[in-house]
């Protein structure tokens, strides 16, 4: 399913994550690979702990960081697409 601003995303239940000195560290239980996010990536991860529309994630990131809406949307979608490909995030259709 293609990712869009209307998509609902949520962290996959097939991973475990922890905050380690301000960085989010994840272990994919399906691939046994470790991942690490810092800064904005960690904040996005916090926001998708529960099912959340991508548009809402962008609203929060654009408000909290000095970034244009267009750049924010492109970066958030790119980050989430990589997470989906890695099996760390599940995508649900939008409303």
What is each stretch, according to the model?
Residues 1-24:
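Long, low-complexity, charged/polar intrinsically disordered regions in eukaryotic proteins
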Residues 20, 33-95:
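Long, charge-rich, low-complexity alpha-helical segments
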């Amino acid at each position: 399913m293609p990712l869009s601003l209307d998509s609902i995303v949520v962290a996959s239940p097939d991973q475990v994550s922890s905050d380690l000195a301000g960085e989010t560290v994840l272990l994919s239980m399906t691939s046994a690979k470790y991942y690490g996010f810092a800064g904005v990536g960690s904040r996005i991860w916090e926001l998708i702990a529960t099912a959340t529309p991508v548009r809402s994630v962008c609203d929060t990131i654009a408000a909290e960081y000095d970034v244009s809406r267009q750049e924010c949307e492109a970066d958030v979608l790119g980050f989430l697409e990589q997470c989906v490909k890695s099996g760390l995030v599940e995508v649900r259709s939008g409303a």
